[in-house]
Regions:
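Extended, hydrophobic alpha-helical segments in both membrane/secreted and soluble proteins
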Residues: 330, 337-344, 348, 352, ...
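Flexible loop/turn segments at secondary-structure boundaries
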Residues: 45, 108-110, 142, 215, ...
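Short, glycine/charge-rich flexible loops or terminal/linker lids adjacent to PRPP-binding catalytic cores
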Residues: 349-395, 405, 432-440
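A structural signal for isolated positions on well-ordered beta-strands in alpha/beta enzyme cores
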Residues: 65, 395, 423-425
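PRPP-dependent phosphoribosyltransferase catalytic core
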Residues: 197, 212-213, 230, 250-256, ...
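A conserved beta-strand->alpha-helix junction
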Residues: 168, 173-176, 352-363, 460-478
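Secondary-structure transition/capping motifs at alpha-helix termini
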Residues: 157, 185, 322-328, 346-353, ...
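Conserved short alpha-helical segments that host acidic/polar catalytic motifs at enzyme active sites
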Residues: 2-259, 264-327, 333, 421
């Protein structure tokens, strides 16, 4: 049986979990991860994966990892920090192979180096199929069902040992154990991946590297993005969370991985199996996360054939028609608010100006989850351009309001800089419901819009006016090929069955969500 090369990671370092993000310290929405995979026997796959991770760095800054296959064995390297901090030329040169997967992660669960390293991906499992490395973006909502399918709390065949230890583990750890367990049982990794797709619920965009193949799989709703590209002249293919990674490695975007699809790439080419078509009774409704377009994705990416920058600019234009106000300038909150601010300015005729300067040398992970530093965080990252805002009526365009504390500090900073009026315009509807699908808002009590009206929020943050883009307005701005979206955080209409387990404090009294299996 092919063996795992322990060149760079100890067994304890390789087989470690990556937990979903808990509450954010800087009052912003965050996802957990970005994933990349490549099959290109004639290329430097580790270096191309490193480039891909750099393009996806906005999706995670706490840790980075790369696993490669030489056709016989897997080798893995990962560590804390940005991709450029984890990998140098010597490290990359030592990762030789025909295929690779990579991962970048964001979390605020703590800064203990041992804990953070345990959460780094890819995870690597050994089994009778030769082993595999797994990188995951999303959150599984039925981990209890997955554990039960492996025999509850009993020992499993996976070397990760999630069930054997009985310790608290992440959904990614459980997914890795599940696949390893059934790969050993069936002697066939692809069968285990199919069983995972049949069983798992929630959001997952996953790349899996085996010694002789690269796999990509996406949940039935297609909540998190995952796309397929080709490397012209290199006889290879790439998988990535976003198309911006293809631009950096010289790949051509072919298409998105479809919801409920399992793709295998090997020496014979691309093979696709549409599990959604074979088992329609298992399928949840398609539901791409709207916040990928509003905030998460890079503006130069394309998701479901929709250009992200174009969508954000359209959100700003639509915002003007829904919530006009007299002002002297329009400014955007860097970075996602800038295209929308430009759209608002163009449609309204109000002058667009830079009004907030972003410190691009501050890592998100610098801010610790303490109240004192949380309040300091906005001043560390943004500074008003006094010349532009002094004595002027300002329209400020931002992507969202979560708890309201960042917006409150932002408005106060602009007033301190001399702004005569501050009118806040948000390119998404009010976030009222928790997310269980890969965003760090899993309890409703942390959302200001769940307990306060627009007028009350406006008063709290100290703005002269506040307006959100309507849900229909937001959807009309995206121009996607398959315009079916997850709107759960706005309207409580969840695309998946009720999570198992469900956080006891997920919902406030009086709120009744709608589940896909209701």
């Amino acid at each position: 049986m092919p063996k795992l090369k322990p060149s760079f990671c100890s067994a304890s370092e390789i087989n470690t979990p990556c937990a979903p993000c808990p509450e954010s310290p800087d009052d912003a929405l965050h996802e957990a991860c970005g994933v990349f995979g490549i099959w290109a026997p004639d290329a430097d796959v580790a270096r191309l994966t490193f480039f891909g991770l750099q393009a996806l760095q906005h999706r995670g800054q706490e840790s980075a990892g790369i696993a490669v296959s030489d056709g016989v064995a897997l080798t893995c390297e990962k560590g804390l920090g940005l991709a450029r901090e984890v990998f140098d030329d010597a490290t990359i040169a030592a990762l030789q192979g025909q295929a690779a997967v990579g991962h970048v992660r964001y979390s605020t669960s703590g800064k203990d180096p041992d804990i953070s390293l345990q959460m780094a991906q890819p995870l690597v499992a050994l089994d009778e199929t030769g082993g595999f490395a797994l990188a995951h973006n999303g959150t599984l909502t039925n981990t209890a069902d997955l554990l039960e399918a492996m025999g509850g709390g009993q020992e499993t065949s996976s070397p990760n040992g999630a069930c054997a230890t009985g310790a608290a583990v992440s959904d990614t750890q459980i997914a890795t154990d599940f696949i390893a367990h059934f790969a050993r049982e069936t002697k066939h990794l692809e069968s285990a991946l199919e069983r995972f797709i049949h069983t798992a619920q929630g959001a997952y965009s996953i790349v899996v590297l085996a010694p002789d193949a690269l796999y990509a799989l996406r949940d039935f709703s297609g909540i998190r993005p995952l796309c397929l590209g080709e490397l012209p002249g290199k006889g290879g293919f790439a998988i990535a969370s976003e198309t911006c990674a293809f631009d950096l490695v010289g790949a051509t975007y072919l298409r998105d991985i479809a919801p409920g699809e399992l793709v295998r790439i090997d020496s014979a080419g691309i093979h696709s199996k549409k599990i959604a078509n074979e088992h329609p009774h298992l399928c949840a409704r398609p539901a791409q996360c709207l916040f990928e377009y509003v905030y998460f994705a890079r503006p130069d990416s394309v998701i479901d054939s929709a250009n992200v920058y174009r969508a954000r600019e359209a959100m700003g234009r639509r915002l003007f028609h829904e919530a006009p106000v007299e002002a002297d300038i329009v400014i955007g909150v860097p970075d996602s608010g800038i295209p929308a601010a430009i759209g608002y300015a163009r449609e309204s005729g109000v002058v667009y100006s830079e009004g907030l300067i972003k410190n691009r040398y501050v890592d998100r992970t610098f801010i610790e989850p303490t109240q004192e530093l949380r309040e300091q965080g906005i001043r560390i990252k943004l500074n008003p351009l006094h010349y532009a805002v002094r004595n002027r009526r300002i329209i400020v365009v931002d992507d969202s309001i979560v708890r309201g504390s960042t917006s409150k500090q932002l408005v106060q900073m602009l007033r301190n800089a001399g702004a005569a009026e501050v009118h806040l315009r948000i390119t998404s509807p009010a976030i009222v419901w928790p997310c269980f699908l890969g965003i760090n808002t899993d309890t409703q009590g942390q959302l200001i819009a769940a307990t306060q009206s627009v007028e009350e929020i406006c008063d709290y943050i100290g703005a002269d006016s506040l307006a959100y883009l309507s849900l229909e307005g937001l959807k009309s701005c995206i121009y996607a090929e398959h315009p079916q979206y997850c709107t759960a955080c706005f309207d409580g209409n969840y695309p998946m069955p009720k999570p198992n387990p469900l956080h006891a404090d997920a919902f406030l009294p009086g709120y009744k969500p709608t589940w896909n299996n209701d």
